[in-house]
Swiss-Prot record:
Coiled coil: none annotated. InterPro entries: CASP/CASPL, CASP_dom, CASPL. Residues 17-37 are annotated as: Disordered. Residues 23-33 have a biased composition (Pro residues). NCBIfam families: A_tha_TIGR01569. Pfam families: CASP_dom. Its main location: membrane. This is Casparian strip membrane protein 2. Residues 81-107, 171-197 are extracellular. The chain crosses the membrane at residues 60-80, 108-128, 150-170, 198-218. Homodimer and heterodimers. Residues 1-59, 129-149, 219-227 are cytoplasmic.
Length: 227
């Protein structure tokens, strides 16, 4: 009986002397590599403020989009102002009337159509320009817009130059050809057509900026790919 009790005591003492097993801590996660760190760092920065070629191309694409929206105003205003420039002048009675109509001059007709076409093109090019903001590496879209913008520069410049010549004759006349100025009688007609010509030349300047931006974006993309 005593031996059994002694064995039991020895067994309890051995169990009390043991320490509980501690859990082994998991190994630390591997440190992220440099590209991963850069990606995480760029993820918290707005895409327009990111450094590097991609952020620069996005800024240029956004500027291109804003310029297209800005160019729609002058072209549309020039087309509407020319189309509504007709004026009637009554002399003595309503039976003797003189009219100044824009479609009496082929230059004004061409001018109105060219500005309307340019405004429609700018409206249709907005989705392509917005796609360039989302995908700044899409060189094919930039090249297509560059070609179309160049065509619009030529078209609007030719139309504005032709209309400017007619407006000058309407204001100053031509003594050698015995053409008298008509703006002294048709104030509204000359005012509308003159404003339309100024707006059209403003649109030409914006188109030139668009061509310059498109060429710079394509050239920078080509240089980055080459290196």
């Amino acid at each position: 009986m005593s031996s059994t009790s002694e064995a039991t005591v020895i067994h309890m003492d051995g169990a009390a002397g043991k320490t509980p097993a501690t859990a082994v801590p998991p190994p630390p996660p591997p440190a992220p590599t440099a590209p991963v760190q850069q990606q995480r760092k760029a993820g918290g920065v707005p895409f327009l403020l990111r450094s590097g070629a991609e952020g620069f191309r996005r800024c240029m694409a956004l500027l291109d989009l804003l310029l297209r929206v800005a160019a729609m105003g002058p072209t549309l205003a020039a087309a509407i102002s020319t189309g509504t420039s007709d004026e009637t002048l009554s002399v003595f009675t309503h039976y003797f009337q003189f009219r100044a109509r824009f479609d009496d001059f082929s230059a004004f007709t061409f001018f109105m159509v060219a500005n309307a076409v340019a405004a429609g093109y700018l409206l249709m090019s907005l989705p392509f320009s917005a796609f360039g903001v989302i995908r700044p590496k899409a060189t094919s879209v930039r090249l297509l817009l560059l070609i179309c913008d160049t065509i619009m520069v030529v078209l609007v410049t030719a139309a504005a130059s032709a209309a400017a010549a007619i407006v000058y004759v309407a204001h100053e006349g031509n003594r050698r050809a015995n053409w008298v100025p008509i703006c002294m009688q048709f104030h509204g007609f000359c005012k509308r057509t003159s404003g339309a010509v100024v707006a059209s030349f403003l649109a030409v300047l914006i188109f030139i900026l668009l061509v310059f931006l498109g060429a710079c974006a394509i050239r920078r993309r080509h240089t980055t790919t080459k290196h």
